[in-house]
Every structure is written in C-alpha cells, then in structure tokens.
C-alpha cells in the first residue's frame, strides 16, 4: 500500500516556478535553501495557506466574517492536506499583560491551585485567616466611630455580564427596596436597563444604620440576612469612608483584615478582582527618572544640567530656575553633583509651600509677572505628562520617564489580598518569579496535606506536564513572569511549540519557521527530540530551517534554489538527507557532506591595547561582570540561551554607548563604569527590525541610491526642457507622483467585516507616477522601470555611474542581488532587512572609529549566505572598525578574532564570564559548552583540510 503523502502541483506563489512535489505525511520534513529562494513561499504561502483556507471555508458565513477572507494561493492543486497550524516568529504578543505563564496557560492552572488549596494569611500579623462569625463581624462594625452612618449590603452579583432582570425582579418580590448597582444606589423599581455585554456588580441594601450603643441585636439580624442572601459575603458601605468587606470564610481576628471567597479570578492580574489597584495589574508605573532629567551630573545648571528645562522659545522655566536659585542661594555655576543634598532636593522635588515671584518673557513678546509655589522639576514633568491635553507635550515629557516597579505590589501585579494566600510556603507572586526549571522542581516536590494533595493532584499534573514541555525545548532559564514582548522570535516560537505538544493533537500539519533560532548547540538535541515526539503522535511537520543538526535529523529534506529571488523557486533536490548530500547540484548537500564549507581563517587579528572596558555589569542576570571588548577586530559573544549575552551587549554596551555618543535617551542596564568610549565616534545597531513601516520605504530609498538615481533623471535633456527638478521623480511629494494613489501604486478598499483589499491603482497602473513624469527616460527606461529592476540588473544598467554602481554593488555583496529596488520594506524578511542596513553602512566612508553591533545576524541565512555575510563583516573590520556579534552559529564563532563566552548556564545559573580569547583558547576551556562544540568543528575542519 502506498504511503500517504501531500501532493503539490503547479505552485507559483512569489518566485516559485510551477513546482510539483510530493511530501510524505507523518514525517519530519525540512525545507532549506538560500535566503529568498522560495522556502517560505512553498511552506507558508502555499501549503499552510491552502490548509488554513480550506478549514476556514468549512465554517459558517457568520464565523468567517470574524476570521477574514483568505485568498487561494497561486497553486493548481494540493492533495492530502491535513488541518494546518503555523508556528512562526511573527506572532509574539507585545501586550504588557502577556507573560510566559499566561501564554502557556500554566498561570490558569496555578490560579486554580491557589483558589482550591490556598491558605490566606493576614499581611499585618502573619497568622492564618480563619472564617468569621456573625459576632466577630458585629464587634468589628461597632468599633467604627459613634454616629457613623452605614449601609449593610449583600453582594449577589460580583462583576458578571448580563442584564440580570430576573434576579432584580426576585429581589423586589422579597421586599427589598434599594440596590447598589456598579456603585450607584437605585430604587428596585427604578433600575435602568443594564448592558448585557458589560460586567456589573449588584448589591442588595439590607439595612441602613447609625453606629451607636444598643444596635447590636438589629445589626446581628441584618448581617445574618445579608449573609444568607449572598452566600456568606457582606459589604459594609461606610458613608464618607471606605467599604468594609466581611466573609463567613476568612478574616484576621486581630486587625479584621478579611478576604473574600478564594476563586481563580482573584489571582488574575487581568481582572479587577485580582489586579493591584495602583498599577492595574501591569506591575510597573511610568515614573519620572532623575537620571534622564539630569543625564550629566558634571554639568552646571547654567550649562543645562536639567535637560527638560534647557531654554527654548519661551524662557519661563529657565527664569523660574534662576529665581529659585537666587532665593535658596544655589550656585548655578557649580556641577550638579557637587550641590548639597538639600539643594538638589529643592530643585528636583520643590520648595514646599513657599511662594516665589518672578518675571518672564512670553513667546509672543512682552513680560509677565507670576507668583507661584515651586513644585520641583520631577513633579512638574509628572503633572505635565498626566494632565496636558497636548500630545506633543506628553511625548516630550515621556522622554524623561521610565517604567519602574509599582510601589504597592513591588512588581508582582496583584492585590494585597491575592498576595496574602500561600500554597507550599509561597504566594503566587513569588512562584511566578521562579524560572521554568525552578518551578518544575518546586511543583514536583511540593509539600501538601493529604486532603490538599487529593484536591490538587489533577491540577499539579497539568502544571508539571506543561513545565516539562517548556524545559524540553530549551527554555528552562525563562521566568514564568517574563513579559512576552521581551522574548526573542525563537523563544516565542518554542513556547508555542511546547503549548502544541501539550495539546497532544494528532493528524495535524505543523509548519514551523526556524525553531532553532537563539538556541545553543547544547540544547539542539532536545528541540529535535521534541519535533520527533510531535511527529510520532501522528503529525506531519514541515520545518523551514538552516541548522545542520535539524537537517541531518530530517526524514525528508527539500532543497529549494538554486539561487535566490528570480534565480530560485525550483526544487534542486529532495529525499533523505543522505540522498541530498550525494546530489552535486544541491548547494545544501555540498555543505552538509563537507565538500563545501566556511574556512577557518588562516590567521586571526590580535587583540590590541585599544579596548572598551566594562566594569561591574549587573543588568538582568549579569553578576557584576568585568569584561574588555577589543577594538578594530571581530568579537563574538557566545553562551547558552539565557546566559546574559543580550544583557551585556544590547542593554549595557549598546545603550551606554548610544547614551554617550548619540545622546540617546535610552537607559542602559546597570554597570559601575565603562572606559574607552572616547576612541569611538559612531555606534550602529544592525538588527532585524524592518527598514521602514510603510510600503513607501524600499531598499533604494533606505540606502540613499534613489536620490542619486533621481539626480540622473533630473539631468536628462527631456527633464531640463520640461523644467523638472529632482523632486519631480519622488513618489512621496506632489508634482511627479500619481495623485490618485498618492504615489503608493495601490489603492486600499475597506471591506468592513472582511479584510481590507489592496488593488493596483487604475490611473497609473501601479507605477506610482503620473504620465508626464514617466515620459522622461534614461537609456530607454523611465523611473518606474528602474524601481522594478532587480539590484543585479540595476548594477549593470548604471555601470557607467560610479556613485550609483558603488551603492548597488554593496547590496549585491550582501547577497541581495535578487531584490527589486522598489520592493516594499514591509515584504522583506528580518534577515533581508538586516543586510540592507549592512549594505547602507558599507558604502559610507569609514573613520575607523565605528562599532557595529549585530544580534544573531545568521537568522534566516543559509550557510552560503553566512559565508557572504562574513566577507562583508570582515570588510568593515579591515577598515579599522569594530564588530561585536551575539551568535550561536559555529561557522561564525570559528571565524571570530576574539570570543567572550558567558554562562555557564542560563537564567540565574548564568551571568558570569566562562572564558575569553581566540576560538582555539575557548575550545580548550573544559567548563565552556561553546568550547566543547567548537573543538569538534575545528578538529573536523582540520581533518577535512588534511584529507584534501
């Protein structure tokens, strides 16, 4: 019987050239090939898109309107498709409320655990809270000041959706006259219609009393009635005071601290029932940061030490500052750090109630006298940020503010009540501060009573199972409260992978995009085993991947190419990894078999005395690290995932240099001092973020070559006759562009319930320019024709214009010859965007004082692309510049001049320097995981060289 398979016929998405391919089902299939060869076009834009479209088509029209219309991919037929799930890197939630624990649903089970077996403790007296009797409630109320007016309320609905008409009617029938609905007292016969889609709180007014001697009996009767109505809950509305909450279940006998019935939503920071009231469950508050207000404490007040009050068009604040200094005898020519603590406090936090009189010049001319209390710079910024109606003012003030942990919950996000409940000696805020490996160990060994163990058994099983999956995909160093928005693409993808394994689905087609990104070689085996486990459940996995180990572990390998863009889009080779390795046409096969490889450099540039010295780096998990980064060579920072590489390079090195060199407002991670910055004049962070957020940005505009091309068109005879200047050939301004589409070339049609549809502009035919502009040609081509050329074609077309050719050649050098000059920035992959940025740096004149920082530049790159990238990076170093790279890829690590290896483990087990030196030095360091794998690679390369 024939093995089941997925049969694709006539795939033409993007650059695919009418591909026919048969893929075995229930196998681990890896698709590889050069960057831009068409891997994602086949895996995501054809196979996954059709699987998803067919599933959506099977739903009702009502459901489809919320999911959106899915276009049919450009393919003739696909047979044997299963329901498809895509696990890519673009769907990371940036919501500040989303954490590792919430995304993986572990937090839901932890909340349930605390609600079922949690023990509440009084935060004031640290004693377990027991249930309250009616007598205890009476005694507590009688402690209120005499003549205090109170209302006894029975909460019958607590923050639930619905119109609740039947309930209100029943309350009226029982003889109750008043209700408190969402904080407002209303007559039971006069209740407005409640919005059924909103949450409401309804409390019955059981009695209204004035606190005085002799009311105890009536009070006790009314409390019993209220408790009966609301299943053991009581709210006392103290007129002109705060509500008191009582429960038959929990309250402190000493101070009366009481807590409602334990339920899961009480432990949710996304619910008003559980969230900290100060920060609304975010754990952080935007607070004025004195270090941003006074960035350089060596400056005097006259030199502009207080940055937000540096003179602008109005001299209001400078005049006020001068007057304050006169009144309090503060020397304005003394460095800020040498002022007394009292003087600094007056400037920053105000002068109390003392009024100050001063005269200032108004913007429109003329002077004005003011008498006011000096509030201080910090309260002034805070007030203007929170109260100003001007968006511009709020934006300006926010530059001097930082997210700091909330003072009430200390960053734990939850209310005081929620944090008073303990399981196994920890509250829920403490548990989520654990890393995944620590949490797994804690829950496996948790100590519960026999009764609690019986209740918690099933919940613990779910928690342990999910933590185990996360541990198995190499994420043991992540803390449960880590914000999703701070995860790398690879981490977010592996979290989704672990969640999918937890669902234990079978018969599904999973399409993954480079799951090994950001993963150290040490953890690769665990990831591959996870993929095999998913396959063994009866699923088909299509993985777009360049990782050597993953390709070798595949059941079926597909090499797409042979080149990129127009030169790709074909199946070069497919079959088992062994079959592909024997195929001489397959570039991937040649690298896998060792016939081709990235060579170890014949010599390494020695580290000179010129260096950046970082002392006492303590950002995130760094443990007071001291490290030197040599200048004018290529340094690679290595270490297992979570060891502190990004903390050292991005948080400390980059942000501190950006602050000093670029006068950036970013706040670097903690460190004691950094020396050697004066040897640099430029810092460039070449990351994988888009080169532009709109379709108007493209490689030609980003690299600046489009300016030169427009100059060429403005110099043509036709342009001179017509009086066209350079601006005529821009699609961003009026004049030469098509006004029907405003130079976009496409028109957006809003479809309301369906997704917006983009269609080519009928007036300009998608060419972006008006007819008159397109009549101007250079060598037979108009400006729109130029934008449609690939970089390679344009390089030949402009070969006689050195200025243009030089810039275009840098794009070819970084492997982007296949990209069109006008390709929308939004359609470039992260790796392509990064290489466009590199190209734009390559054609600039070097001073030899620049430092380039790259974070995993090999993401999305084939070995052949990496070889090209390394040549480009070495060109930068040959100019005398410095390159610092965070990388796991051994081909990059082995070609480094100098390595800084962090670790030894991830998370709390990392944050120290394991070894520094050349790759050969690291390979001899037994305590280095990187060294272990590097040694194997260096020995294998040496062996291959000798064999030749």
From Swiss-Prot:
* Any one GO cellular component localisation term in the record: cytoplasm
Protein name per Swiss-Prot or TrEMBL:
UvrABC system protein A
Q: Which residues form the ABC transporter domain?
A: 309-587, 607-935
Q: How would you summarize the oligomeric state and partners of this protein?
A: Forms a heterotetramer with UvrB during the search for lesions.
Q: Which family does it belong to?
A: Belongs to the ABC transporter superfamily. UvrA family.
Organism name: Staphylococcus aureus (strain MRSA252)
Q: Which gene encodes it?
A: uvrA
UniProt binding sites for ATP: 33-40, 639-646
> Which GO molecular function, any one, fits this protein according to its record?
DNA binding
């Amino acid at each position: 019987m024939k093995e089941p398979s997925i049969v694709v016929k006539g795939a033409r998405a993007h650059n695919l050239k009418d591909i026919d391919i048969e893929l075995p089902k229930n196998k681990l299939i890896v698709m590889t090939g050069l960057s831009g060869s068409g891997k994602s076009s086949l895996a995501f834009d054809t196979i996954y898109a059709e699987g998803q479209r067919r599933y959506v088509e099977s739903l009702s029209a009502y459901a489809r309107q919320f999911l959106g219309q899915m276009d049919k991919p450009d393919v003739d037929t696909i047979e044997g498709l299963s329901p498809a799930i895509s696990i890519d890197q673009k769907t990371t939630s940036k919501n500040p409320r989303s954490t590792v624990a919430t995304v993986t649903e572990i937090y839901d089970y932890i909340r349930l655990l605390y609600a079922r077996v949690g023990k509440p403790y009084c935060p004031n007296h640290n004693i377990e809270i027991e249930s309250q009797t009616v007598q205890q409630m009476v005694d507590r109320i009688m402690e209120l000041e005499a003549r205090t007016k109170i209302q006894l309320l029975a909460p019958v609905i607590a923050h639930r959706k619905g119109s609740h008409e039947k309930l209100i009617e029943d309350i009226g029938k029982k003889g109750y006259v008043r209700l408190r609905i969402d904080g407002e007292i209303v007559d039971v016969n006069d209740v407005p219609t409640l919005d059924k889609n909103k949450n409401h709180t309804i409390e019955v007014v059981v009695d209204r009393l004035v606190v005085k001697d002799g009311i105890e009996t009536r009070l006790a009767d009314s409390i019993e009635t209220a408790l009966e109505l609301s299943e053991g809950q009581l709210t006392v509305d103290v007129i002109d005071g705060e509500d008191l909450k009582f429960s038959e279940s929990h309250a402190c006998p000493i101070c009366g601290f009481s807590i409602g019935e334990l339920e899961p939503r009480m432990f949710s920071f996304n619910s008003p029932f559980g969230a900290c009231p100060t920060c609304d469950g975010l754990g952080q508050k935007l607070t004025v940061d004195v270090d941003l207000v006074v960035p350089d404490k060596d400056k005097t007040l006259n030199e502009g030490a207080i940055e937000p009050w540096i003179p602008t068009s109005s001299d209001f604040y400078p005049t006020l500052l001068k007057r304050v200094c006169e009144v309090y005898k503060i020397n304005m020519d003394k460095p800020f750090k040498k002022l007394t603590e009292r003087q600094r406090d007056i400037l920053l936090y105000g002068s109390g109630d003392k009024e100050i009189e001063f005269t200032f010049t108004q913007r429109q001319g003329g002077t004005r006298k003011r008498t006011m209390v000096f509030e201080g710079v910090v309260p002034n910024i805070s007030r203007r940020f929170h109260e100003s109606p001007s968006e511009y003012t709020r934006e300006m003030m926010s530059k001097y503010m930082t997210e700091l942990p909330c003072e009430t919950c200390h960053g734990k996000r939850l209310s005081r009540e929620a944090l008073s409940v303990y399981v196994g000696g920890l509250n829920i805020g403490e548990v989520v501060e654990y890393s995944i490996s620590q949490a797994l160990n804690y829950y496996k060994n948790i100590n519960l009573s026999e009764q609690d163990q019986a209740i918690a058994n099933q919940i613990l099983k779910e928690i342990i199972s999910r933590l185990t999956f996360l541990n198995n995909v190499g994420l043991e160093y992540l803390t449960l409260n880590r914000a999703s928005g701070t995860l790398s693409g690879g981490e977010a993808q592996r979290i989704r992978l672990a969640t999918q394994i937890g669902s234990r689905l079978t018969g599904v087609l999973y399409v993954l995009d480079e799951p090994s990104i950001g993963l150290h070689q040490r953890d690769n085996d665990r990831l591959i085993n996870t993929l095999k486990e998913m396959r063994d459940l009866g699923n088909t996995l299509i993985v777009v991947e360049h990782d050597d180990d993953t390709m070798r572990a595949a059941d079926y390998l597909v090499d797409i190419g042979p080149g990129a863009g127009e030169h790709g889009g074909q199946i070069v080779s497919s079959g088992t990894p062994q079959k592909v390795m024997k195929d001489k046409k397959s570039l991937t096969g040649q690298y896998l078999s060792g016939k081709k490889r990235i060579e170890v450099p014949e010599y390494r540039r020695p580290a000179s005395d010129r260096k950046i010295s970082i002392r006492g780096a303590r950002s995130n998990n760094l443990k007071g690290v001291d490290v030197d980064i040599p200048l004018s060579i290529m340094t690679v920072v290595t270490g297992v995932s979570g060891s502190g590489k990004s903390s050292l390079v991005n948080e400390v090195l980059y942000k501190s240099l950006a602050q000093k060199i670029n006068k950036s407002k970013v706040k670097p991670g903690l460190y004691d001092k950094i020396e050697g910055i004066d040897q640099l004049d430029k810092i460039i962070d070449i990351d994988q973020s888009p080169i532009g957020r709109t379709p108007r940005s493209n490689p030609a505009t980003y690299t600046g070559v489009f300016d030169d091309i427009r100059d060429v068109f403005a110099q043509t005879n036709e342009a001179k006759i017509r009086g066209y200047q350079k601006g005529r050939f821009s699609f961003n301004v009026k004049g030469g562009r098509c006004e029907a589409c405003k130079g976009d070339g496409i028109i957006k049609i809003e479809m309301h319930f369906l997704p917006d549809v983009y269609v080519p502009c009928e007036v300009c035919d998608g060419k972006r320019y008006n007819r008159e502009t397109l009549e101007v040609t250079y060598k037979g081509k108009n400006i729109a024709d130029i934008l449609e050329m690939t970089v390679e074609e344009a390089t030949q077309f402009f070969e006689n214009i050195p200025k243009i050719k030089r810039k275009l050649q840098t794009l070819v050098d970084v492997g982007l010859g296949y990209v069109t000059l006008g390709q929308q920035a939004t359609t470039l992959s992260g790796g392509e965007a990064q290489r466009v940025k590199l190209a734009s740096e390559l054609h600039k004149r070097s001073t030899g004082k620049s430092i380039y920082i790259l974070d995993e530049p090999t993401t999305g790159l084939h070995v052949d692309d990496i070889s090209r990238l390394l040549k480009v990076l070495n060109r930068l170093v040959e100019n005398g510049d410095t390159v610092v790279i965070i990388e796991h890829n051994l081909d990059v690590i082995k070609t480094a001049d100098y390595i800084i290896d962090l670790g030894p483990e991830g998370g709390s087990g990392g944050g120290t320097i394991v070894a520094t030196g050349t790759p050969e030095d690291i390979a001899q360091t037994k305590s280095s995981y990187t060294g272990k794998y590097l040694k194997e690679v260096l020995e294998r390369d040496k062996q291959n060289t000798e064999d030749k």
